[in-house]
A protein has these predicted regions:
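Active-site proximal loop and beta-alpha junction motif in alpha/beta enzyme cores
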Residues: 1-101, 111-159
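Helical hairpin unit composed of two closely spaced alpha helices linked by a short loop
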Residues: 104-106
Length: 159
């Protein structure tokens, strides 16, 4: 799937910053967190963590989601670098909480990791519901996302 060109310019994300950078320091409840800010049509903050299994996704995700520097709120990705070709990711989605999968979040994490030269492209992003492969050639280029599609719910509605 062509996911489009990621937006890295702070006003377009929207994110309040004086200039564009690959990482930003942001105060969250008295502690400085280092984040990447990316828009994939929706805003994402991506943090690199040592272990996604011990990351405080609910607490820190909620605090960042409504941070004043993101006027439209933000999705928060907790990214663990496995090696140059793999990332593990948990996503706290704005207005929802933690989700099992997030294509735009996987793309935002890939952009953040590639920009910081932590991984190469293509990179596999492992989410709870399965892996996604993200290919990005760099600034100004669209991201290509591929992965399995699975049914997670069947239902009926009477109208």
């Amino acid at each position: 799937v062509d996911m489009g060109v990621p937006e890295l310019d702070p006003p377009a994300i929207p994110f309040q910053a004086t200039e564009a950078a690959s990482l930003y320091d942001i105060d969250v409840n008295g502690q400085v967190q280092r984040i990447a800010a990316v828009s994939m049509g929706n805003p994402h903050a991506v943090l690199t963590v040592a272990d996604i299994n011990t990351a405080t996704v609910a607490e820190l995700g909620a605090a960042l989601e409504s941070h004043e520097r993101f006027p439209n709120r933000v999705n928060v990705g907790f990214m663990q670098i496995v090696d140059r070709s793999e990332i593990k990711l948990r996503v706290f989605e704005r207005g929802v909480g933690e989700t099992d999968a997030c294509g735009s979040g996987a793309c935002a994490a890939a952009v953040a990791a590639i920009q910081q030269e932590l991984v190469d492209s293509p990179v596999t992003v492992h989410l709870t519901r399965g892996p996604l492969k993200i290919d990005w050639k760099g600034a100004g280029s669209p991201l290509i996302m591929s992965g399995p599609a699975k049914t997670v719910f069947h239902g009926r509605i009477r109208i």
